[in-house]
Amino acid sequence: MKHNTLRAVFQFSFFIGICTFIMIAGYSYQINYNQRMGIFYGGNITFKKVPKVVIYTATPFFDVPIENSILRDCSEKIKNSCTVTSNNKTFPIADAIVFHSRDINETKLSFFNKNRRYDIPYIMMAMENPFFAGLTVYHNFFNWTMTYRTDSDIFHPYGAFVKSYVPAEVNYSEIWNSKTKETLWMVSNGNAQNKRKELVEKLIKKGMSIDLYGQLYKKEPAECPRRRGPPGCDVKFHSPYKFAIAFENSNCKDYVTEKFWKKAGIYKTVPIVMSRKIYRDLGIPDSMYIAVDDYPNLEEFVHHIQNVTSNEEEYMKYHKWRKQFKIVDTNEGNIGFCQLCQKLAGYKRKLVPHKVYENLNSWHSTSTCDNSFATRFL
């Protein structure tokens, strides 16, 4: 009888324990579910359909909030399963946090260090090269990088070219007939590290015809003032030029910005760059641009430009790529965020290994740049 009583007490205690465990587990699940639905800390975050991936952008991009519209050119599958928001209340439920390097301040850094979430990646987004990225010392803070460099965790280029499935119809005669001027240089930043201003002015002294516009030269096209012109005026302004200077403010690994992509793309000019290696390393066709370092001196370079300027057959060789390829303008950041959504989906399935950058500055450093190029010609 005594043994039966003890057995009954044990069974009852075990039963109570199991019930308690189920209640706690169920409650924990409900809390987690409610948080995923945006019901936490008295918040009022709501999604019509709970996304599989939530990306919280903790900083703006040059003071402009990064919102879900950044995904507008992604596939429907990505848009239906991923949300990008700058709403601070999504911090506890986010699957990743993105910081733009030029918009991080000490207050934000202190908050996210103090309230660190170790279960999700902190992502550094930097579209500027190391000289202008605005990075200070971030030790063991970031897990992923999202930059223009191909070795970033998320490749976030300014532009890209893709092969056309069907050869495009290109009116070469129309392109040639629209070209009535030689070369344009539109430039705003005079604080370049690579002496591009000195190189351009040396080219002019060597006989190259270059029209100079932009903040650096305090000259704006009357028909298309910066940020105030009518839609499409930039295309109309650039279209008469055969060539356009596309020198970046620094010569860094993989650093090819809209200066190149727009000139070759919608402007239909031939970009002139400093060094071929940077562009060739990205797989950009050699015939899409002209590189100064293909020539032993500036005299021979200028002679080539002048020869091509007056020769339709030679000039149109730099447009033949248009039949097979097209340029995708990713300057609005969509390609990078599309890829980020995809990677995070894999991360949630534990397909992406956890990592942390011990010293981000050593990765995104000026050692990836070579600004000595122009000096050999000056």
UniProtKB/Swiss-Prot annotation:
Localization annotation: Golgi apparatus, Golgi stack membrane
Topological region Lumenal: 29-378
GO terms for MF: 3-galactosyl-N-acetylglucosaminide 4-alpha-L-fucosyltransferase activity; metal ion binding
Glycosylation sites: 44, 88, 105, 143, 171, 307
Catalytic activity: a beta-D-galactosyl-(1->3)-N-acetyl-beta-D-glucosaminyl derivative + GDP-beta-L-fucose = a beta-D-galactosyl-(1->3)-[alpha-L-fucosyl-(1->4)]-N-acetyl-beta-D-glucosaminyl derivative + GDP + H(+)
Cofactor: Ca(2+)
Keyword rRNA-binding: no
Biological function: Catalyzes the addition of fucose in alpha 1-3 linkage to GalNAc-beta-1->4-GlcNAc-beta-1->3-Gal-beta-1->4-Glc (LDNT)acceptor. Unlike fut-1, does not add fucose to Man-alpha-1->3-(Man-alpha-1->6)-Man-beta-1->4-GlcNAc-beta-1->4-GlcNAc-beta-1-Asn (M3), Man-alpha-1->3-(Man-alpha-1->6)-Man-beta-1->4-GlcNAc-beta-1->4-(Fuc-alpha-1->6)-GlcNAc-beta-1-Asn (M3F6) or GlcNAc-beta-1->2-Man-alpha-1->3-(GlcNAc-beta-1->2-Man-alpha-1->6)-Man-beta-1-4-GlcNAc-beta-1->4-(Fuc-alpha-1->6)-GlcNAc-beta-1-Asn (GnM3F6) acceptors.
UniProt-recorded name of the protein: Alpha-(1,3)-fucosyltransferase fut-5
Organism: Caenorhabditis elegans
